[in-house]
């Protein structure tokens, strides 16, 4: 049934007739015979091929236990030449570089890499997928997509809510692990990657890995000058949060990618909870003309978007006497393209897994490369304790210390003052 739409109850009934629930102890390999019997029964009843996907929407502690039980019960492989076994795993993919490597090694001992699907729902969003199409199918953009024409790039994901009922998980994760290591890093890779030789999963994922490996590592001095962590006032009073917690609910960071395309171009990440607006954005700031004739006249406006969209802004002369310049937008909104239903991010990603298309799923080497960049920051924060943890009021734009990143004149108007 489409959200907000009428639907055929008969179709829903037909679908639900083929949905089954099975209760068993998923930590005990001896119990998995129940799952095997149910699979074999349903395959025979409906004449189904031996094609099975295991989806682990479970606590992270189960990411090693369940695959091990599948191995011990023989459910990790198929004897059918036309069959397959695939496993989908939700984030977090480890909590550090070491734990990510351990998890990857464990999974690859049980499944082949091409059978492992590490899901990030951000990559299932239509606008995110359209980044690649926008870049590589339009001759107007790709020649400009480099350090010669781009001044800086901002990628942000902000929320108005706090941790709500996720205090136990969030206090052990924080904004860096929860948002930046996966969602924002993946978004950045689509913005920064080189064109793949062909539009197929492995060439695309090869280019993503190259981007992650090209990020300039931080020195300890860099971490203090280029990374800001914050915590909203009242976080320590949240349910299941330690009263002396140093977990960050806000991160702003500046970094560079050391390759030809992005030499000298600063990238910025912003993410946080209890901020003024809920928004996910990628903002490309193009360089100004060498000689500014209309200084101060091309002012920016609100860039609030309630729908998925792509917007290109440029200055034009207003009608009438004089040369009053106004910033105007050329917008593309998905809801104006078609009245047909836009699939949810998970719908797209689950269908891809069924079809064996891993383009929008994280590969193990990309995962480890992203952790290699993030891990030193987390270790530095652990050593510092509460030092350089800045507090901000709920509903504000985050800690004032964010200005040390030097982006205060470039940041998006709808995110920060």
Regions picked out by a protein language model, each given a short descriptive name:
Residues 1-89, 93-417:
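Secretory/organelle targeting and membrane-embedding segments
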């Amino acid at each position: 049934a489409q959200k907000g739409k009428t639907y055929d109850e008969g179709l829903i009934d037909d679908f639900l007739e083929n949905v089954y629930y099975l209760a068993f102890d998923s930590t005990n390999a001896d119990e998995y015979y129940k799952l095997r019997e149910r699979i074999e029964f349903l395959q025979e009843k409906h004449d189904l091929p031996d094609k099975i996907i295991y989806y682990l929407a479970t606590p992270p502690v189960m990411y090693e236990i369940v695959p091990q039980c599948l191995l011990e019960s023989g459910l990790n492989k198929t004897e059918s030449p036309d069959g397959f076994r695939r496993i989908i795993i939700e984030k977090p993919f480890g909590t550090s570089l070491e734990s990510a490597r351990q998890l990857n090694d464990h999974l690859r001992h049980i499944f082949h890499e091409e059978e492992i699907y590490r899901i990030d729902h951000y990559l299932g969003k239509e606008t995110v997928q359209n980044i690649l199409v926008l870049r590589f199918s339009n001759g107007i953009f790709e020649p400009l997509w480099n350090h010669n024409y781009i001044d800086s790039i901002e990628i942000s994901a902000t929320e108005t809510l706090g941790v709500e009922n996720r205090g136990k998980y969030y206090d052990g994760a924080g904004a860096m692990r929860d948002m930046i290591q996966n969602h924002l890093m993946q978004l950045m890779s689509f913005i920064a990657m080189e064109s793949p030789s062909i539009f197929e999963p492995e060439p695309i994922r090869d280019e993503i890995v190259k981007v992650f490996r090209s990020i300039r590592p931080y020195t300890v001095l860099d971490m203090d000058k280029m990374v800001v962590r914050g915590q909203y006032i009242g976080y320590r009073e949240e349910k299941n949060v330690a009263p002396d917690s140093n977990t960050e609910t806000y991160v702003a960071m500046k970094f560079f990618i050391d390759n030809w395309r992005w030499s000298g171009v600063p990238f910025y990440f912003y993410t946080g909870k209890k901020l003024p607006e809920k928004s996910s954005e990628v903002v490309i700031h193009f360089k100004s003309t060498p000689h500014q004739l209309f200084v101060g006249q091309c002012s920016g406006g609100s860039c609030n978007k309630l729908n998925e969209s792509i917007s290109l802004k440029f200055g034009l002369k207003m009608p009438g006497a004089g040369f009053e310049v106004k910033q105007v937008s050329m917008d593309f909104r998905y809801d104006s393209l078609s009245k047909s239903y836009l699939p949810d991010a998970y719908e797209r990603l689950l269908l891809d897994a069924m079809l064996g298309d891993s383009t929008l799923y994280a590969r193990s080497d990309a995962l480890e490369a992203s952790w290699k960049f993030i891990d030193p920051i987390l270790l530095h924060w652990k050593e510092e304790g509460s030092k350089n943890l800045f507090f901000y009021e709920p509903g504000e734009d985050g800690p004032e210390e964010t200005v040390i990143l030097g982006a205060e004149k470039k940041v998006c108007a709808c995110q920060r003052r």
